[in-house]
């Protein structure tokens, strides 16, 4: 599960912890990235990570079949470097959202998608829980930048995908439903 903030990661971790008997939770910050990936490859589990997990993590094959992206990965505008860049673009008469923030978020989202499909034979589901990809005018730019695939907006399609792969995951039972209910209630 990819997050854009540690606060969101921690809230979801604490909500899912009581439900994690079948799939241990591997939380960024409690283990090194390398040890988390090793554990993940050996034992069915769930990785909860932020920035460093959006890129450079390579888990090809059957070990990774689902990536959940909780929120579109826009840089936080109040972070000093981002804030300075936005102000610089504004002074130059350039729209910082369209010409800086949006392109960076699109690249980051593509990187998040890339965690799932590393080789031609890899298959899986990316679940994007941020409705802005559908509800905002810039959502089409995100969609156009994503790899080809089947896009759906209901869990039935996800269940069918895993069923057809011969793996009836508990993906659509308490854990994912809990994430989705947290998302709709708290806006992860």
Question: Where in the sequence are the language-model features?
Answer:
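ASCE RecA-like P-loop NTPase motor cores
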Residues: 1-188
């Amino acid at each position: 599960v990819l997050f854009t903030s540690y606060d969101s990661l921690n809230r979801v971790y604490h909500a899912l912890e009581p439900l994690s008997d079948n799939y241990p939770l591997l939380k960024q910050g409690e283990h090194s990235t390398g040890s988390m990936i090793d554990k993940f490859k050996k034992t069915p589990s769930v990785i909860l990570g932020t920035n460093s997990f959006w890129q450079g993590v390579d888990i090809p094959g059957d070990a990774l079949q689902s990536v959940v992206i909780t929120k579109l990965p826009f840089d936080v505008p109040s972070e000093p470097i981002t804030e300075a860049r936005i102000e610089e673009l504004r002074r130059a008469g350039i729209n910082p959202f369209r010409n800086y923030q949006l392109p960076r978020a699109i690249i980051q989202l593509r990187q998040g998608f890339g965690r799932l499909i590393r080789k031609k034979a890899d298959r899986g589901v990316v679940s994007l829980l941020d409705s802005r990809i559908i509800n905002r005018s810039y959502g089409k730019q995100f969609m156009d930048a994503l790899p080809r695939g089947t896009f759906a907006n209901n869990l039935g399609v996800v269940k069918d995908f895993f069923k057809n792969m011969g793996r009836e995951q508990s993906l659509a039972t308490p854990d994912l439903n809990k994430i989705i209910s947290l998302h709709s209630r708290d806006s992860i």
